C-alpha cells in the first residue's frame, strides 16, 4: 500500500476512532442485517440473543465491539507494516473458526465496515478512501486466513 492510501486510512480513522463504540455498533447492526445467521454465534453465559437489538445492547457484546475496533485501530496504526500483526491476526482467524464463523462471512464484515465508514464520514468517504480501506481489510483477512488454514 502506498503512502497516499495509508494517509487516507489514517485521516478517516481519526474521525471514527473518536466514538469507536458508536461506530462499531453501526458496523455490527449492518452485519446482522446482511447476515442474520451470524447472530446465534454470539452467546455469552449460555445466553442466546433473541434479536440483533438484544445482542447490540448487551454489555458482553459491547465489549466484543470494543475489541473489534481495537483490532482495526491496530491495523491502522501498523498500516505501513501489517506483517507485524501477522501472528496476532492468524490467531484471531483460528479463534473465529473455532466458534463456527464461516470464512465467507468476512466478506460481509468487509461490506459492513465500508458501510460504517461511509455513514461516519459522509462526503469525506471518497472512492479513493473506499479503495484504501478495501485494500487494508483485504490484507487483514488474508492474515486471518492463515489461522483458518492452519498455516
UniProtKB/Swiss-Prot annotation:
Keyword Transferase annotated: no
Annotated Globin domain residues: 1-149
Cellular component annotations (GO), alphabetically ordered: cytosol; mitochondrial matrix
Modification after translation: Phosphorylated during hypoxia by ERK1/ERK2. Phosphorylation regulates the heme pocket hexacoordination preventing the association of His-64 with the heme metal center. Thereby, promotes the access of dioxygen and nitrite to the heme and stimulates the nitrite reductase activity. Phosphorylation during hypoxia is stabilized by 14-3-3 proteins.
Gene: NGB
Enzyme class, UniProt record, top EC level: oxidoreductase
Similarity field: Belongs to the globin family.
Keyword Hydrolase: no
Keywords, comma-separated and alphabetical: Cytoplasm, Disulfide bond, Heme, Iron, Metal-binding, Mitochondrion, Oxidoreductase
Purpose of the protein: Monomeric globin with a bis-histidyl six-coordinate heme-iron atom through which it can bind dioxygen, carbon monoxide and nitric oxide. Could help transport oxygen and increase its availability to the metabolically active neuronal tissues, though its low quantity in tissues as well as its high affinity for dioxygen, which may limit its oxygen-releasing ability, argue against it. The ferrous/deoxygenated form exhibits a nitrite reductase activity and it could produce nitric oxide which in turn inhibits cellular respiration in response to hypoxia.
Protein name per UniProt: Neuroglobin
Residues annotated as signal peptide: none
Residues that bind heme b: 64, 96
Known partners and oligomeric status: Monomer. Homodimer and homotetramer; disulfide-linked. Mainly monomeric but also detected as part of homodimers and homotetramers. Interacts with 14-3-3 proteins; regulates the phosphorylation of NGB. Could interact (ferrous form) with G-alpha(i) proteins (GTP-bound form).
Biological source species: Oryctolagus cuniculus (Rabbit)
